[in-house]
Amino acid sequence: CQRYDDGHYAAWRHLADEAPDLVVFLRDYSYESAPRKDRVRTHSGTGAAKTLDDYRARYAQYKSDADLQRIHASAPWILTWDDHEVKNDYAGDRGQDLAPDFLARRTAAYRAWWEHMPMPPSTRPVGPDLRVHDRYDWGTLARFHVLDDRQHRDAHACPPAGRGGSTTVNVADCPDLLRADRTILGSAQERWLEEGLAQRDVRWNLIAQQTLMAPFTWTKEGRYWTDGWAGYPAARDRLFDAIVARKVANPVVLSGDVHCNYVCDIKRR
């Protein structure tokens, strides 16, 4: 994540100094939020980004930063998106505020993202949809399976009353959380991922995606956060079952989202 009004991009400056071979960016290239006077820097516009012109202006502002320009010039990028490129905590065609015109907003946001990111022309948006998931090989050393767990996911389980989006829940209070048919990737992307992981021609399989895949609880009593994979446990189980069944070589999950660093072994449950 690189929220412009949180601070300056010193990290990009230092990374560019190290001359990386590749940059892998996993979510929230830009933020849709309205400008605030109490921030380090101020977002463009007079309100949250909602229209195509709004989103284009937001990317123009982010890309005016000299350090961000430099890191783009330093190395090729592999990247995916998450929610803030559109609207916080959206799920598929459903916005957090349940606004009836959300799909039009998503369409505008997707178009602006595609226009400003190093994506091939073949991925041009089709209506409100844009294919982001893809595979990239680094010789025979590693394969990046880049996922999109935002566009095709089911709605969050047990959202707060009167709105969409995530929360923390106890499993006992939210039977919907454990439904076997719930998906965070969509069935087509799940099949695509399993088929790619089954190939045995690289040493490392790097699953690059937006949100925490490791189980994440907020309390000792087991309150689960529903925006990450903990909110879609059946989908995570299917992926882990496939990794075991296919005997996938050296799987490693790379995750974005939480503005912290974790290194851990991911358990099935």
Where is each model-derived feature located?
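Metal-dependent phosphoester/phosphodiester hydrolase catalytic core
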Residues: 1-269
